[in-house]
Regions:
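Cleavable N-terminal export/targeting peptides
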Residues: 1-36, 283
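Outer-envelope beta-barrel architecture signal
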Residues: 32-40, 113-117, 184-188, 223-227, ...
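Residues that define the transmembrane beta-barrel architecture of outer-membrane proteins
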Residues: 36, 100-104, 167-171, 205-211, ...
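Transmembrane beta-strands of outer-membrane beta-barrel proteins
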Residues: 41-45, 120-122, 191-193, 230-232
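Outer-membrane beta-barrel "beta-signal"
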Residues: 46, 266-283
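Outer-membrane beta-barrel translocator domains and adjoining extracellular loop/strand segments
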Residues: 52-59, 130-136, 200-209, 240-246
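Glycine- and aromatic-enriched membrane insertion/assembly motifs of diderm outer-membrane
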Residues: 59-149
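Gram-negative (and chloroplast) outer-membrane scaffold detector with strong preference
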Residues: 107-201, 279-283
């Protein structure tokens, strides 16, 4: 983990922990019989990725095979020799890490002493996995889409893409229910939500419908604030991601080809993730 991730995580967790304990409630009936109130919440979400296997192909040409860079790549991005000497990992597919640090969400909602509804915005990012840590100089982030015969030992006529991470920004409308327990400060809750995700895959952002579920328990600190812990499940509907820009056209001679130019590619990837959530309500 680098220093940037540590700083961002520490800062946002601190903000969640020290939200001011002031009331944002609006009583809508008599003061001795309040029915509903507005609330805000913030939470930290360590998340596990549960993505399918990614497949990627060019839009305008028939992709015969996908090659990854060799594991001991020296970091020189423009090869002086044949391309098939560096793109040697046949049938390469990007995989993603879990997200233990950079998952956060905030919500504004309306609670009715049991039922509640909220609008939630969340942010999560999943880095590309370096399998076994064996790939040097970020070689695991690159692949070549080869249009030549797939029987060759390396990429010959191809374009290249670079994949650093997958980012998922969710805009969700959740319907929730808090189970009130008489005389106890704890309240189990359950939520179901639908919305839209802005999913960035290989630097191309595609809007997608999505749905999620949440289950947890909250603990009332005082009438104006609660803390909660729970689990969540989130799934993106639709697995095709378009408008992925390709770059750096290579041929077997190692030079850019005037006949084959960069264009766009599409990827197929099932996006699903789950994890825990820890946060705070302020009423």
């Amino acid at each position: 983990m680098n220093c940037k991730k540590i700083f961002i995580t520490s800062t946002l967790i601190s903000l969640v922990s020290f939200l001011p304990g002031v009331s944002f409630s609006d009583v809508i009936q008599e003061e001795n019989n309040p029915v509903g109130s507005v609330y805000i919440s913030a939470k930290y979400m360590p998340t596990a990725s549960h993505f399918g296997k990614m497949s990627i192909k060019e839009d305008s040409r028939d992709t015969k095979a996908v090659f990854g860079l060799k594991k001991d790549w020296d970091g020189v991005k423009t090869p002086s020799g044949n391309t098939n000497s560096i793109f040697t990992e046949k049938d390469y597919s990007f995989k993603y890490e879990n997200n233990p640090f950079l998952g956060f969400a905030g919500a504004v909602g309306y609670s009715m002493n049991g039922p509640r509804i909220e609008f939630e915005v969340s942010y999560e990012t999943f880095d590309v996995r370096n399998p076994g840590g064996n790939y040097k100089n970020d070689a695991h982030m690159y692949c070549a889409l080869d249009t030549a015969s797939s029987s060759t030992a390396g990429a010959t006529t191809s374009v290249m893409v670079k994949n650093e991470n997958l980012t998922d920004i969710s805009l969700m409308l959740n319907a929730c229910y808090d189970i009130m327990l008489d005389g106890m400060p704890v309240s189990p809750y359950v939520c179901a939500g639908i919305g839209t995700d802005l999913v960035s895959v290989i630097n191309a952002t595609n809007p997608k419908l999505s749905y999620q579920g949440k289950l947890g328990i909250s603990y009332s600190i005082n009438p104006e604030a609660s803390i909660f812990i729970g689990g969540h499940f989130h799934r993106v509907i639709g697995n095709e991601f378009k408008d992925i820009a390709t770059s750096k056209v290579f041929t077997s001679s190692g030079n850019a080809s005037s006949a084959v130019s960069p264009g766009f590619a599409s990827a197929i990837l099932d996006v699903c993730h789950f994890g825990i959530e820890i946060g705070r309500f302020v009423f």
